[in-house]
Regions:
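Short, solvent-exposed alpha-helical surface patches in non-cytosolic proteins
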Residues: 10, 15-22, 109-115, 131
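Short secondary-structure transition/capping motifs
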Residues: 7-10, 76
């Protein structure tokens, strides 16, 4: 794979930066809009019954620790649909980003990230660009080098302990951390592993990494021309990379 030179922001978009975008444009995020059943039902298996109208209200998924071990294939055990949760109220009604303006913005859909990037006269990176940026130009295993994860609690914000019920918080953060809280990689980029997931412009296609090597070098790949997730075949998805404060070796590693 070959890519042309490109610029990338030093850190994830903070609440302060996203607030500037909202103030300037009046943009309303996906999580702040009531759900249009006619729009969403085409992303679900045929025959899925319509939920009650009081469920189809503006909201987002909020993480809650479980009381003990659960099936890690069943994310409904720890992700809970919460009406009123959005970027200004990350944990739902009654929560606030006050005191967290330097934290990365959360509850941001692909459409929201794309809209912010356009407003800022930028764009989302391709997955290939993101991968190169995360590498820091090295062949190291992690953005911080080759130190194993258990010895890297001062290098990135991720889950220490047993997911999703025992977080030892050895890195000092049970949730998001302010941007630039941990050391940068060799390119000077922060949080290329951990803290929050980061959007790429590519469509998600499970077959993206299979290609005919006889074609030689692929220049500036920008992903598949189709959405392809056999687990949720009707849902259009885009690539996210980098992991988050909820990731550890047992989950999303």
């Amino acid at each position: 794979v070959s890519i042309d030179p490109f610029y990338m922001d030093l850190h994830e978009v903070s609440n302060t930066e996203f607030d500037q975008f909202i103030t300037a444009t009046g943009y309303v995020t996906v999580a702040e809009k009531d759900i249009d059943w006619d729009e969403i039902k085409v992303q679900l298996p045929k025959g899925t019954p319509k939920p009650a109208d009081d469920i189809l209200k503006a909201g987002s998924l909020v993480f809650k620790e479980t009381s003990g071990p659960v099936d890690l294939m069943d994310y409904s055990q720890w992700w809970h649909w919460t009406i009123g949760a959005h970027w200004r109220q990350p944990e739902g009604p009654g929560s606030t980003i006050e005191g967290r303006m330097d934290h990365p913005v959360v509850h941001v859909a692909y459409e929201d990230a794309h809209a912010y990037a356009l407003w800022a006269d930028k764009r989302l990176p391709t997955e290939a660009e993101w991968e190169w940026a995360a590498s820091g130009g090295t062949m190291d295993k992690y953005p911080w080098g080759n130190d194993p994860i258990e010895n890297a609690t001062d290098k990135a914000n991720f889950w220490q302990g047993i997911f999703p019920y025992k977080n030892l918080v050895q890195d000092g953060y049970g949730g998001t951390a302010p941007v630039k809280s941990f050391p940068s990689n060799p390119f000077g980029l922060f949080d290329m592993a951990g803290n929050v997931w980061e959007w790429c412009q590519d469509r998600y296609d499970v077959t993206s990494y299979t290609f005919d090597k006889s074609k030689g070098i692929i220049n500036n790949p920008n992903g598949s021309n189709q959405y392809n997730d056999p687990r949720e075949p009707y849902a259009p998805k885009h690539i996210i990379r980098g992991g988050s404060f909820l990731c550890n070796e047992s989950y999303c590693s």
